[in-house]
UniProtKB/Swiss-Prot annotation:
Annotated ranges, domain GST C-terminal: 88-226
Protein name (database record): Glutathione S-transferase theta-1
Ranges where the GST N-terminal domain occurs: 2-82
GO biological process per UniProt: glutathione metabolic process
Organism: Bos taurus
InterPro entries for the chain: Glutathione-S-Trfase_C-like (IPR010987), Glutathione-S-Trfase_C_sf (IPR036282), Glutathione_S-Trfase_N (IPR004045), GST_C (IPR004046), GST_C_Theta (IPR040077), GST_N_Theta (IPR040075), GST_Theta (IPR051369), Thioredoxin-like_sf (IPR036249)
Keyword Oxidoreductase: no
């Protein structure tokens, strides 16, 4: 059995892996896991990943979870162009620096924005107070300021003059609040221009394909009561 990727393009880390594999022509079998149907909560899925999360990479008997680990595995195994994850010590460290920061900063805030603005009230039928939503969006704004001020600055891409894994991970995170209707690029010309460069670098068709699901998140159908009961505690823990 060749390379298998268990993904749902509703998930921002899954989108990053999907784009990376497609852009670098890495052959893989897509195993779609529909999160909104609770497929990740099944006993069968738990046999693949006891954490019951996507993404998952399966390469023969080797199973790997966690999106950054998967991206690095693919970059190393398939000898992708150096700009994605450079050999140069300091250039590589810059990519690592961003990937270390984003987990608890940009990712958390983008995830909370999507769930507080759309997925909790629309998909799970759970109201979110205006105060909670305002706090969430203010924290997202602060993370965007750091993204622009510390990481992007006046460069073409987050870590230099070429696209890297840092840019790919960042843009897929930012499309979460975009999918919720947040104007994250409005009033931020540097970030808006960076987004255009990232889209051009990966290819606009591939970019749109990967983000079709998240851009329709507002149209999600309400979860059935049984699924809601199973999902709600996990969701609340995830977005704390």
């Amino acid at each position: 059995m060749g390379l298998e990727l268990y993904l749902d393009l509703l998930s921002q880390p899954c989108r990053a892996i999907y784009i990376f594999a497609k852009k670098n022509r890495i052959p893989f079998e897509l195993r779609t896991v529909d999160l909104r149907k609770g497929q990740h909560l099944s006993d069968a899925f738990a046999q693949v990943n006891p954490l019951q999360k996507v993404p998952i990479l399966k390469d023969g008997d080797f199973i790997l979870t966690e999106s950054v680990a998967i991206l690095l595995y693919l970059a190393r195994k398939y000898k992708v162009p150096d700009h994605w994850y450079p050999q140069d010590l300091q250039a590589c460290a810059r990519v690592d620096e961003y990937l270390a920061w984003q987990h608890t900063a940009l990712r958390r805030n983008c995830l909370r924005a999507l769930w507080h603005k759309v997925m909790l009230p629309v998909f799970l039928g759970e109201p979110v107070s205006p105060e909670m939503l305002a706090t969430t969006l203010a924290e997202l704004d602060m993370a965007l300021q750091v993204l622009e001020g510390k990481f992007l600055q006046d460069k073409a891409f987050l870590t230099g003059s070429h696209i890297s894994l840092a840019d790919l991970v960042a843009i897929t995170e930012l499309m979460h609040p975009v999918g919720a209707g947040c104007q994250v690029f409005k009033g931020r010309p540097k970030l808006a221009a960076w987004r255009q460069r990232v889209e051009a670098a990966v290819g606009e068709v591939l970019f749109q394909e990967a983000h079709e699901v998240i851009l329709k998140a507002k149209d999600s159908q309400p979860a059935d009561p049984t699924l809601k009961q199973k999902m709600l505690p996990k969701v609340l823990a995830m977005i704390q």
